[in-house]
C-alpha cells in the first residue's frame, strides 16, 4: 500500500483547511519567501518598488540614515545617498523613479541615479502612511506631528504637495495602499489605542469601510485600493499579513520574521517586498510575497 505524506508532514507547518480552492483575500497560493539581505540592517526606512524583483529602500535608523539600496530580485546594491538623512519617512514609486517624503517636511525625488530635493510637505511629520503606486501621484496620510497624531492628508502632482480632505480618524503609523486618486488606509494608533478601522479615499473624500482583523500599526503595505496587502507591525513585533479584495480583509500567510517600523513596497497584493525593519533590533533580511491573482 502506498501512503502519501501530507503537506503538513513534509513542511512541518500548520496550514489552513479550505472547503474549496485555496483562495483567500483575493489571492491564491500566497506565501513569503526569503530574498537577499540588505547591506546594512535598518528600520524606519522608506521604500518604493513595483514588485519583489525591483525595489528601493532609503533612509532609516540607527541614526538619520542617508543610505539608498536597490534590489534586483536577488541582491541589494548601495547607490547614491539621500541629500538629507532622516528616519520614519515614507516612499512611493518604483526602483528607478521614486519620491521620499516625511521624517520632517523634506521631499526628494529619485531618477534611478540621484536624489534631487523637491518641494516640502505642508505638515512636518513622521511614521506616516505613503502610497504604493507612481511617485507622480504621491499620497501622504496621517503620522505623528509632535505633538499629536496627524489626520492631515497631502497629495503630490509631480511638483508640489497640496492639502486635501482629512481622514475621519487621525492615526499614526497607518497602512496605506493606492495613490492620490484612490486609496485605502487602515490600522494605525490614535495614541492610544491601536485601531483596526479602515477608510477608502476616492480622490476627494474618505469613507469608512471594513476593519482589518488585527489592530496594529507601523508595518508595511502594497497594492491598490481594491487589492491591498498589509504586513507586520511593531510594537509588538508581528508577522500578521492581511489581504484586501475590495470589500473584506482576510488573514493570509505570516511573515517569517515578525517585525515592523519599516515601509513596504509593491504595486499589487500578489507581489510585494519587505526588507529590513525592527524586531528588538534592526534587521537586514528581505522577504518576498508571491501569490497568484484570482480570476473569475
What spans do the regions from the language model cover?
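Polar, enzyme-active/binding microenvironments
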Residues: 1-296
